[in-house]
Amino acid sequence: MTPYQVTIVKYGTRRTVRSDVYLNYHLYGEPDGPIGMDYFFWVVRNADRTIVVDTGFSATGGANRKRTTLIEPAAAFDSLGVDRAAGPPVVVTHAHYDHIGNLGLFPDSPLHIAAAEYDFWTGPYATRTLVHHSVEDDEIDHLRRASRDGRLRTFENAVELAPGIRVLRIGGHTPGQSVVSVDTTDGVVLLASDAVHYYEEYERNMPFTQVANLIDMYDGFERLRAMRPDHLVAGHDPDTLARFTPVGTGTLAGLAATIGEEC
């Protein structure tokens, strides 16, 4: 098996406060204060294949929530040389607006999503206020169309997309929240997506404010620790890019980092 290189792309950002991102923050007895939140998607590739992990928020989804766009995802994918027309597989870690907003950029791609995630967002509770605010209806409809067209690939608990790339359902944040494990030249990389928004969340067992099942989220932290990856990539932490090899030139300079050598 040829190992992969992972590229982390920061396409958006916002500023908020700690009590807005940590569940029941007042219980920790700590002062509130400012915190950043960055928005990422990921590209996994070697000489044989390219796999896209999430697609970022759309212009509409970002504007509806006053998020700042740093680079349009389409431009970022093109800068990386991702052949969108070739239909590379797309992993949907979960169906929130900031992860599936640009599925239309990949009209021929198979979409891989946990069955629990798809079932929830097409089920009877998806319109309830406390969960619905995190999605865009037309983007959920895109998943429905992909299912009708035969492009949606659901899995129960785990699936190997290719040698060295595994997707595992963790739950917690959403019913089908998934993570992606990738074998690279620099060891095993775990793309935690929103199973871990912030490194502090993971290290201090401080769940994010948006949670479908709190106990599953706590259990998810333990499951990720048990996996003992060489590198864990959080889903929204502003410190993420600084932990890895920066992309220093071109359109993505300062907005991307890599793990592993180009293969």
Question: Where are each of the predicted segments found?
Answer:
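Active-site metal-binding motif and surrounding structural segment of the metallo-beta-lactamase
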Residues: 67-113
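Conserved beta-strand hairpin/beta-sheet module of binuclear metal-dependent hydrolase folds
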Residues: 13-76, 179-193
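Core dinuclear metal-dependent hydrolase active-site scaffold
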Residues: 8, 42-45, 51, 156-185
